[in-house]
From Swiss-Prot:
The gene is URA1. Binds 1 FMN per subunit. The activity is independent of the presence of oxygen. It comes from Saccharomyces cerevisiae (strain ATCC 204508 / S288c) (Baker's yeast). Pathway: Pyrimidine metabolism; UMP biosynthesis via de novo pathway. Catalyzes the conversion of dihydroorotate to orotate with fumarate as the electron acceptor. Molecular oxygen can replace fumarate in vitro. Does not use oxaloacetate or NAD or NADP as electron acceptors. This is Dihydroorotate dehydrogenase (fumarate). It comes from the Eukaryota. CDD domains: DHOD_1A_like. Its cofactor is FMN.
Length: 314
């Protein structure tokens, strides 16, 4: 009995649910091509701003024993660079599954302008609005301000008619899950992506008695194994609170087939990999696909839908 990882997401069919997390291995067209030619089921572009950004000073990304700390500051080549890439790829590979396109403006107005550009283009993929970057000095995470989140989405959906998801920060309180889900349920969202890195962690080099990343006096977003329990909780919380039409993408701490299975069991439809992709490169997708299939076959599952979201309580 062979397990199939075929994943239906919105109106698209992907060979498996795995993709990169925006920010990892997607800065240049070369990296995007490597993702497109890998075993990943889908891929997403680097979060784009209006103009090219260099991001924060280095060192700004460090691998640590159980994950990573980063304070990248949204370095990217600007929206025109990525839009040109995806439009060319659509034209050259018309039968390929839909591409994900990420945007992350520095203000509501910039986000609206970025989304207008996508709305007015021939892009026929899926857009992800990043409401949760924790690493831009002086710019708070929009999605921790519930009123601002609602205002942003009201303005977005006044004109944006293409499939749109939002990338969320981690939440830690049931009241916050409830409030955010109530807001999100008011809009025709395609999905939520939980979670972005846990913001403003601190990692210390004891030998040097110093922080390890330069920006923000060493404070940075934490990813990898450290964040998996929080990621699973957010996936589960939103899966059980959102309208069934709003899918959940699970991101955080996925480095094995077991991790992937747990995210799917909590209700995730697609899975994004960040820290471990940074460490292993695109070959991770082949490994993790095999590991997930092995788990499913050992349990007698032939498709992900047989267990997705069916987490047992005790």
């Amino acid at each position: 009995m062979t397990a199939s990882l075929t994943t239906k997401f919105l109106n698209n069919t992907y060979e498996n649910p795995f993709m990169n997390a925006s920010g990892v291995h997607c800065m240049t067209t070369q990296e995007l091509d490597e993702l497109a030619n890998s075993k990943a089921g889908a891929f997403i572009t680097k979060s784009a701003t209006t103009l090219e950004r260099e991001g924060n000073p280095e060192p700004r990304y460090i691998s640590v024993p159980l994950g990573s700390i980063n304070s990248m500051g949204l370095p990217n080549e600007g929206i025109d660079y990525y839009l040109s890439y995806v439009l060319n790829r659509q034209k050259n590979y018309p039968d390929a599954p839909a591409i994900f396109f990420s945007v992350a403006g520095m203000s509501i107005d910039e986000n609206l302008n970025l989304l207008r550009k996508i709305q007015d283009s021939e892009f026929n993929g899926i857009t992800e609005l990043n409401l949760s970057c924790p690493n831009v000095p002086g710019k708070p995470q929009v999605a921790y301000d519930f009123d601002l989140t609602k205002e942003t989405l009201e303005k977005v959906f006044a004109f944006f008619k293409k499939p749109l998801g939002v990338k969320l920060p981690p939440y830690f309180d049931f009241a916050h899950f409830d409030i955010m889900a109530k807001i999100l349920n008011e809009f025709p969202l395609a999905y939520v992506n939980s979670i972005n890195s846990i913001g403003n962690g601190l990692f210390i080099d004891v030998e040097k008695e110093s922080v390890v990343v330069k920006p923000k006096n060493g404070f940075g977003g934490i990813g990898g194994e450290y964040v998996k329990p929080t990621a699973l909780a957010n996936v589960r919380a939103f899966y059980t609170r959102l309208r069934p039409e709003i899918k959940v993408i699970g991101t955080g701490g996925i480095k094995s087939g077991k991790d992937a299975f747990e995210h799917l069991l909590c209700g995730a439809s697609m899975l994004q990999i960040g820290t471990e992709l940074q460490k292993e490169g695109v070959k991770i997708f082949e490994r993790i696909e095999k590991e997930l299939k092995d788990i499913m076959e050992a349990k007698g599952y032939t498709s992900i839908d047989q267990f997705r979201g069916k987490l047992n309580s005790i």
